[in-house]
Structures are given as C-alpha cells and as structure tokens.
C-alpha cells in the first residue's frame, strides 16, 4: 500500500489555486480543502491545510501522540465524498468523509474505517477551512487519548506421545528473581548474592545483570518447576530483600532431562533469532529454541491475535476498536512412550561415556525410546551419533551371505586370522577355540567370528553388502520427522576396506537408531522404517530394490537366537517372557584398541539397540544394559 501520492498533492495545490482565482466570481467548492486534509491525515502534517481557528503544529503534535504506538504501521487515507449542507447559511458548512486503511500485518486482512471532518466557509478569506478534533483520525478518539495494538497470544499446542500420553504440556513453574523496585539500591548487590547462594547458582552474572537493569526492573535469576523437585521453602525467599517469586505455567516435559536432545527447549527468543526473523519474531516472544520445539514451531505456536483499543492518559482501555482472535497451535503427536523413555534414561545414568539406547516397535517402526546418556547432553547421540557398529553389523553381512547362497547351516571356515591385501585380521581376544575351523554359519554369528564375515563380505562384494543394509533399513535416508541419521554403507569398497566393513568397522557408520532398525526389521520379517513424528507422519524413503523377505528374516532371527542361547549374549537367555534374540558388537576406534560397545536385541514387539562409546566389549558393557532394560520394561 502507498500513502497519498505526489500526483494527488499536486492536484490538491492546483485546486487550491483555482479556488482562489475564482473566488471573486463563483464561491469555491470545499473539494480542495477536503483533499488537502486527506494529505494531512496521511502525513500528519497539516501545514498546507486551511484550518479554522486552529494551529497546524498543535494539531500535528496532538494526533502524532494519539497514533504514536502505531505510527510505523502503514496506512492510507482517501477522500470518499464531500457534501455541502445546503441548508446552512453563514457560515456555510460541509462534511468530508475519508476512508482510512491500516496494513496491520503480512496477511490480506486490513483495518479500514470511515471518518468525517467538518468544513466551514470563511467569508473573510473566501476559503473553506477544516475544523479538526482527534476523532477525524479515529472515530471515538478524544483529547488526551491514544490507540494501541496489543498482541493476544495463541495457546501453544502440546507434544503428545504413545497412546496420546501428555509429554510436553503447560506445567507450573516459579520465576524467581530480584524486584529492584521493592528494595533499596543499597540492598541490590547483597540481595543478588544471597539469592544466588540460596539457588546454588553463580553470583557474579546475577549481580552484573541486576546492576545493569533499570531501577524498577525485575531481574529473573532462575525458573524452577513448582513440584516435588522444588525444595526451597517460601520463607527463605522472603528473608532476602527484594526477592520476588512469580507463579507461571510453561510448556515442559515430565522431567528436565526427558528426551531433551530430541524435544528441545522453549523460551524467550534471543537477539540473534529476533534479528534473523525479519520482523516475524519480536523481542520478548517465547518460541521453540531447539529440537522438535523449534522444528515444529509454526505447528505448535499457532497464530497470535491482536486487539486495537483506545486508551486514556492513565493507560486504561476505553473502547475496543478491533479484535482479531488468535488461532491456537496444534498438538504434535510423536511416538515416544513416557515410561519406556524414562526407563532408558534412568539405566543410562550409570554410564560414564557417551551412550544411547533406542527402542523401536517392529510392527510399525514407532520409536518408543531414544535416550542419550548424561555425558552426551545436550548431544543427540541416540538419533544423530555416527559410529562404527562393530559386530552388530554382522547381521547385515550375514544377510549378504544368505543372498550369496549360504544358509544358517552352511559350513564356513573360521580361522584364527585372515590376511587381506597384506593386512592381517584376527578374532577378538578370548574367542573360543572350540568355535574355530569348520563351523555352521549360525555358530559363526553366535560366537562372532571375524574371519568368517570378512571373507563373506569379500565374496558378496560391496554392492551386495550395501543392498543388504538397505533391506534391513540401515542404508537409507531418515524419515523420522526429526533430525536423525540412520546409517551409511558404501557400495564401492574393495579389499581391506571391504573386509573391515564386513565386521562393522572400515567406513560403515550407524547411529543407535540405525542398529535398532536392523533388529526391528529382523523381528518384523520385513524392512522397518522408523519414525518419531506420528502426525503428520513423514513419507517413507524409497524402498529397497531387493527388500527383506520373510524367509531371510526368519533365517537371521534363528541365528540371532543362538547368540543369546549359547553365544556372546548368553547372559540374556534367562530373561522371562517371549524369546530374546540379539547380537553384540565391539568396534575399536584407535591404535590403543579403545572400543565402542554395542548390543542389539529383540523381544516380542520390541527392538532395542544399546551403544556405549567407551566399553570393554559389546557383551560385557552394552549387554548388561540391554538385559536390565528388557527385564524392567513392562
């Protein structure tokens, strides 16, 4: 929209001139004055408007003050009509009608209204003059009043989990800080230090923020959940001059740590966010700052509304002129199960290095838990960590071998070592000598014979290994609805690299989610596509050219059952309930033979992957975590 144009201004001047030239003969029409007033209302400069016993500068100042809260909002003024009151004599009067339109936001909806101004003919000067009051700018506006637009927040949607569980909802909090207006300047520093000590936070930053704030400012120190975790009694706060405890409700997960790397945080927009938003986010707005809260901000937040009202000089509303109701945000439906996620997080609390546990429901691919250990916070190890999967990848290599003609009963050779292009590979320390030599493929997987799967990868070739990974849901683009990585298996490796790939080292990579997907695909009898956001559910990735068949999954499951029955995960064979199948894995990642520990297991409609960055071995470090999880999971 544009303001009154220069062409319009020129025509106004011309009409005024014509009016003065013809004054001697024919009484002028009020059109020129009416159009000059339209120009003045648009610019709030009335110096070119003939006024009746009024000062142009005073009128400009009065209306500028009245419109100041919205002065930067684009608006246009157009003259709609001018009607002379034929019944009037001296002075002659007329009424000018104007349409004023405000462009309130980026939408197509504007605020338009009609207003009027009184015009009187001055016999002495032979000109029409405007007689103005504040209502000429806004109907109903009186002296010493102003208009303002106030935002009306939309209700933010919840984040809900498996079976519509309430995960992120508004929960009671306490905003605790120092109200400088209710304490003396001499108390500000000592109160800030005392409050910091009570809250067990650093004192210097709070002292500095208090000093920098205005004399009547409330300086927030911390936000605490108003639940059983808040143990500081109110009387402790009351003993510190100026401390104020404000009650509020904000979107929060069940606990502070609950899926935090995935769900993310919600809070006041930073200066950087405000600047980058190009006006869509304003200082003080609360938005999603990370994770799903940020990624689905528009869905959750909805659209704020607003009101435009007349206020008196005491800032009290007098009349509401316009109301645009907010559109509430929509709930975000995800697949995390509250109890399953909390169990996974509690078990990982015992780990001292980067770790993760992911649980997937094989029947539909729903991610029920995606927990990252405390040492990885805020990193999302569960969904984004890229690591060599070690011997858990032998399930993929086993599929490539099955497709290359082997069966679980095929006799394969498991030597203690094997050489590939001059590089010697060996089995892990402590590999049972009874499982060396000629053994069934199922036994090679049960005891995790490196040399068998190195040779198997070399015979199957890299494209077949990559295709087997795709069939098990690993070598695909993620379709979870959230930031995630599944896995990467190249189709052009040869020689030593290909041999190392066959045992989950080399250049293959997987996330904990990726290996949980492999296990889930075996349990499901078909390729599983894991997903976290249930509504709207993301589109599935392109299907494998050679998808996993039910027979292939059955063969893999039978071999993984032997891993638990008498192989590297035999400590899990006493878990009650439905049968457990699995595979352990160890991936050395440096010259000192430090290793990542892995375990994948399935039981019923549950597939689990456990990863620990620094471990003594998959069965020794990750296996007990998987066992505890399956034992305690309901």
Question: Where are the predicted features?
Answer:
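Extracytoplasmic/periplasmic proteins that interact with beta-lactams or build/remodel peptidoglycan
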Residues: 75-80, 90-354
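Secretory targeting and sorting signals
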Residues: 1-26
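Second-shell loop/turn segments in exported
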Residues: 36, 52, 103-106, 146-150, ...
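Gly/Ser-rich catalytic serine loop of serine hydrolases
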Residues: 156, 384-393
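Short, low-complexity, disordered segments immediately C-terminal to signal peptides
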Residues: 16, 25-39
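Short, gly/Ser/Thr-rich active-site loops of penicillin-recognizing serine hydrolases
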Residues: 625-634
